[in-house]
Amino acid sequence: MKFVYTPSEAAEEGVRGPSDLPKLIDKAMSLARAPVSTFKVGAVGLTSSGEVFLGVNVEFPNLPLHHTIHAEQFLVTNLALNSMKKLTHIAVSVTGTIFGAPCGHCRQFYQEMRNAPEIEILIKRPKDGIDEFMSLKSLMPERFGPDSILPEDASLLLEQRDNSLVLSDPEEICSDPEDCSHTKCRALAAANKSYAPYSKCPSGVALICGGEVYKGWYIESVAYNPSLGPVEAALVDFVARGGGKEFNEITEVVLVEMKDVKVSQEATARTFLDKIAPKCDFKVLHCYKTNKN
């Protein structure tokens, strides 16, 4: 199970440029988890530095549909988790032969990237003789994006950020939380990368399964509803690196967020985890923002 390809690994799969992205779509679709719709969606994306990333839809039975992770959301979250800076091209399919534009939800989600209007999307319908790339700008010409609200120099999605958060409880935190195996350290590190410029309520999650730590952070949309929660983001990491493990094998989850804020993840995270990982130990740790920045 592979969700990230270096340029040389992509070339071995026959992907040497944007027009070759469909060569990996079957692999992407095979990794989707779609027990509700049974429609396995795959997304293949190319970065400005030549890496190729896969995205898949992930659905959760017995939960509201808004918990669903769209393949395009998975793809961008996968980029963020791997510190990629720029997505340039994307191909999305549910059939392996017909490629279409992202849904409106994902078109809006993608607006958080600085180069969103220039992202090229493969449109391919063999029966109609259509095989071309279209810019996201052409698919969403009158966009509502970060520039409608945020200052011009604001850090956007996939750009470096540090929310300057520390835990409220003065427990010892490892000097390099990115490399340690403590869930509280990894969850705090995730929260510090959280993209929440509108609510200013960053949060992060770390979870453990089989001794491995997975993490993710809240990714906000200017349109609010397309935002991706921190548990969902951590599950992107889990699906991408977990080797096919099931959600009910997760044993521990830690959420780090600020206390008494307008946007809290605790209640929805608890409901979510009660369904997908009922035996996990769920903890919430509060943090606060320092005056570092």
From Swiss-Prot:
<dbReference type="InterPro" id="IPR013171">
    <property type="entry name" value="Cyd/dCyd_deaminase_Zn-bd"/>
</dbReference>
<dbReference type="Pfam" id="PF08211">
    <property type="entry name" value="dCMP_cyt_deam_2"/>
</dbReference>
<dbReference type="InterPro" id="IPR050202">
    <property type="entry name" value="Cyt/Deoxycyt_deaminase"/>
</dbReference>
<feature type="domain" description="CMP/dCMP-type deaminase 1">
    <location>
        <begin position="16"/>
        <end position="147"/>
    </location>
</feature>
<feature type="binding site">
    <location>
        <position position="103"/>
    </location>
    <ligand>
        <name>Zn(2+)</name>
    </ligand>
</feature>
<comment type="similarity">
    <text>Belongs to the cytidine and deoxycytidylate deaminase family.</text>
</comment>
<comment type="function">
    <text>This enzyme scavenges exogenous and endogenous cytidine and 2'-deoxycytidine for UMP synthesis.</text>
</comment>
<keyword id="KW-0378">Hydrolase</keyword>
<dbReference type="GO" id="GO:0008270">
    <property type="term" value="F:zinc ion binding"/>
</dbReference>
<feature type="binding site">
    <location>
        <begin position="57"/>
        <end position="59"/>
    </location>
    <ligand>
        <name>substrate</name>
    </ligand>
</feature>
<feature type="active site" description="Proton donor">
    <location>
        <position position="72"/>
    </location>
</feature>
<dbReference type="Pfam" id="PF00383">
    <property type="entry name" value="dCMP_cyt_deam_1"/>
</dbReference>
<dbReference type="GO" id="GO:0004126">
    <property type="term" value="F:cytidine deaminase activity"/>
</dbReference>
<dbReference type="InterPro" id="IPR002125">
    <property type="entry name" value="CMP_dCMP_dom"/>
</dbReference>
<keyword id="KW-0479">Metal-binding</keyword>
<feature type="binding site">
    <location>
        <position position="106"/>
    </location>
    <ligand>
        <name>Zn(2+)</name>
    </ligand>
</feature>
<protein>
    <recommendedName>
        <fullName>Cytidine deaminase 6</fullName>
        <ecNumber>3.5.4.5</ecNumber>
    </recommendedName>
</protein>
<dbReference type="GO" id="GO:0009972">
    <property type="term" value="P:cytidine deamination"/>
</dbReference>
<dbReference type="InterPro" id="IPR006263">
    <property type="entry name" value="Cyt_deam_dimer"/>
</dbReference>
<keyword id="KW-0862">Zinc</keyword>
<feature type="domain" description="CMP/dCMP-type deaminase 2">
    <location>
        <begin position="178"/>
        <end position="293"/>
    </location>
</feature>
<comment type="subunit">
    <text>Homodimer.</text>
</comment>
<dbReference type="InterPro" id="IPR016193">
    <property type="entry name" value="Cytidine_deaminase-like"/>
</dbReference>
<feature type="binding site">
    <location>
        <position position="70"/>
    </location>
    <ligand>
        <name>Zn(2+)</name>
    </ligand>
</feature>
